[in-house]
């Protein structure tokens, strides 16, 4: 019995000496260090012919020095076009004055032509313009040519209505679908392909996604394309100091019939009389995805700001003949306005 007690005592002493030598018993497992917080990210939603509204807000952000440390951009549809323009401007390849001149010089015929009253329209003029401006003037041929990491959202037409539909085509490999070697014009044509109105587009040489037709990413789950930011943060192990979500104004009255008339379709005002308003739906979707961001990434939401015009004038979504007036109206409105913190925006339910 004494021998057993002595052996047990020696074992306990040895264990104590070992613990002391190793610094004592280990405490709770340490949490991994928080990723560094730095840089600014932009999220630019779709806008169709209201593209100059977003451009004017982006110029105002730049003038106020809020894009000095711009590190990532995510956009879809017209927001994708503005994302590429910001790349050109921040890198010194183009000025805001030149970009505004391009927008103000556009007309419907520079974007689409229509045979009779058939939909979708022919967007070959848009492709020609993008090749001239994006490839020729800005010097961007592939996604990898963009100096700022940039994601452009697209979706498959057959996937519309499903939950997971977005493909976030980034200039850097942050996800499975990104391929920096792809044509930037092809991706822009897909991202601006408004379902029904504009034809779906195919992207040449794809290997990371199916070789099929694609449409506007904003028509799927990326109505507010913020998730690319989460993917970029995870891939680069960082957190952005600030995020600005820039969008366009939503009109407050039904204008479906007027939009259709611009495309040669006369519904005799039926949709407007019924009060059918895609604008109200768009506003609800905007708030829905902002609320989703707040729930999904509360830390990021605390550092996110929303800027969306709210002036008196109304402009049609498919009227590319009024871009100059839109730029001027938004620029004037922005002088007395500032981006609103996301949580404040949601609490005030700023839905036009």
Regions found by a protein language model. Name each.
Residues 41, 116-246, 299-340:
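Active-site-adjacent alpha/beta core region of enzyme catalytic domains
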């Amino acid at each position: 019995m004494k021998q057993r007690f002595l052996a047990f005592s020696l074992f306990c002493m040895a264990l104590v000496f070992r613990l002391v030598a190793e610094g004592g018993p280990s405490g709770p497992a340490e949490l991994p260090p928080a990723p560094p917080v730095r840089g600014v990210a932009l999220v630019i939603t779709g806008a169709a012919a209201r593209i100059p509204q977003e451009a004017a807000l982006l110029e105002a952000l730049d003038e106020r020095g809020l894009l000095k440390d711009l590190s990532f951009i995510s956009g879809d549809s017209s927001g994708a076009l503005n994302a590429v323009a910001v790349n050109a401007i921040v890198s010194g390849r183009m000025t805001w004055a030149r970009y505004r001149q391009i927008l103000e010089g556009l007309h419907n015929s520079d974007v689409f032509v229509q045979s009779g009253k058939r939909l979708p329209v022919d967007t070959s003029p848009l492709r020609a313009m993008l090749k001239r401006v994006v490839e020729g003037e800005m010097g961007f041929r592939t996604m990898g040519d963009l100096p700022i990491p940039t994601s452009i959202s697209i979706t498959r037409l057959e996937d519309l209505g499903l939950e997971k539909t977005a493909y976030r085509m980034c200039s850097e490999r942050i996800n499975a679908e990104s391929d920096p070697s792809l044509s930037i014009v092809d991706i822009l044509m897909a991202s601006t392909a408004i379902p029904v109105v504009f034809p779906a587009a195919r992207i040449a040489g794809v290997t990371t996604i199916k070789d099929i037709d694609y449409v506007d990413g904003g028509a799927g789950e990326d109505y507010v394309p913020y998730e690319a930011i989460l993917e970029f943060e995870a891939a680069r192990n960082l957190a952005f100091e600030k995020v600005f979500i820039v969008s366009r104004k939503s009109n407050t009255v039904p204008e479906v019939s007027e939009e259709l008339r611009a495309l040669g379709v006369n519904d005799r005002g039926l949709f407007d009389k019924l009060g059918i308003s895609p604008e109200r739906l768009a506003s609800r979707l905007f708030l829905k995805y902002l609320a989703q961001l707040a729930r999904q990434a509360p830390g990021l939401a605390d550092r996110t700001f929303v800027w969306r015009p709210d002036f008196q004038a109304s402009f049609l979504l498919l009227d590319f003949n009024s871009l100059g007036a839109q730029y001027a109206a938004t620029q004037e409105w922005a002088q007395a306005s500032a981006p609103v913190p996301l949580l404040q925006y949601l609490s005030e339910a700023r839905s036009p």
